[in-house]
A protein has these predicted regions:
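Helix-turn-helix DNA-binding motif, specifically the short coil turn and the N-cap/start of the second
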Residues: 47, 56-61
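C-terminal edge and immediately downstream basic/flexible tail or linker adjoining helix-turn-helix-like DNA-binding
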Residues: 53-54, 70-90
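Internal acidic/polar
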Residues: 1-20, 47
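A short pre-motif secondary-structure segment
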Residues: 37-41
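Short amphipathic alpha-helical boundary/capping segments
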Residues: 22-31
């Protein structure tokens, strides 16, 4: 979709401005719960229902932790002078 295409362009722009190590360091600095959910959702492309089952948490907790992880990463990007707002995917 058009929204997904725009999101990919924004994400690619962020990756071009930061090294892989900088991105890794930002993710590593997340609290462990947020980092785990972020990695499963964004890197492993798991659904919240799958994450909830795997981690023995509720889907609501999974969604909340992912949202909070993204907000913390956004703050880290802003601290580096990169404006980025992650759009919710449907």
């Amino acid at each position: 979709s058009e929204t997904e295409a725009a999101e990919v362009e924004i994400e690619e722009e962020v990756f071009h401005k930061l090294s892989a190590d900088e991105i890794f360091q930002m993710i590593v600095q997340l609290p462990v719960g947020y980092r785990t959910v972020f990695n499963l959702a964004e890197m492993e492309h798991m659904k919240h229902s799958e994450i909830a089952l795997a981690l023995n948490i509720s889907e609501g907790t999974s969604k909340s932790q992912l949202s909070k992880a993204k907000k913390l990463l956004q703050k880290s990007l802003q601290a580096k002078g990169i404006e980025y707002e992650h759009r919710k995917s449907k």
